[in-house]
Amino acid sequence: MVPVGRTVYIGNMPPEASAEELLDLVHYGPIENVRLLPEKACAFISFLCGQVAAAFHADSSVRRISLHNRELKIGWGKPSVPPPAIVYAVQHQQASRNVYFGQLDEHVTEETLRSSLSKFGPIDQVKLIREQNIAFVHFLSIQTAMKVVTTLPMSPEWSKYRINYGKDRCAYVPKGQQQIQAHNHQ
């Protein structure tokens, strides 16, 4: 496989900005991983697909995105190929950065999920839907989510819950943005 441009460089990042705030601006398609480097005021977002990365890169360059009133600089990271284990898990198990938890007890809170699961790797977002006893935990990488999905069901304290992959929140492209993307790529 030939390495392709699927990693986008985000410069001029505010040092206090969180991954969640950055990813709230990125609704183009599934992401493999996100690396924040606050000491260098930048981040790298690796999409699963080069076309999605190109759409984000082009649209962000045109519409000029900003975070905490700072205009972000958009560029390219090093071309790369997704690791084969991740490609396989995405194709055969619908792996994503998002892990779904079902049949949760009433004592499970957003804080307990965050503290229990952060040992696997950095977390983007935790969304607990109490009425349905479910939660979605978005990690910064598919690799971390894969570790959670394969490890936790074996653990006695987690085996009573349903654990699987959910849809990456960045894969949801709002209708208005779909039209903009279609227009920009004609």
Where is each model-derived feature located?
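Conserved short N-terminal element of RNA/RNP-binding modules in eukaryotic RBPs
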Residues: 1-17, 41-42, 87-107
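RNA-recognition motif
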Residues: 2, 32-41, 79, 123-133
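Conserved RNP beta-strands of RNA recognition motif
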Residues: 10-13, 26, 42-57, 74, ...
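Short alpha-helical elements within RNA-binding folds
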Residues: 10-30, 101-121, 152
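Eukaryotic short linear interaction motifs
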Residues: 17-19, 33, 42-45, 52-54, ...
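Acidic (E/D-rich), amphipathic helical modules within compact regulatory domains
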Residues: 31-78
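Low-complexity RS/RG/RGG-rich segments used by eukaryotic RNA-binding proteins and nuclear co-regulators
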Residues: 63-92, 155-183
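Ankyrin-repeat TPLH-centered helix-turn motif and closely related helix/turn capping elements
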Residues: 109, 113-176
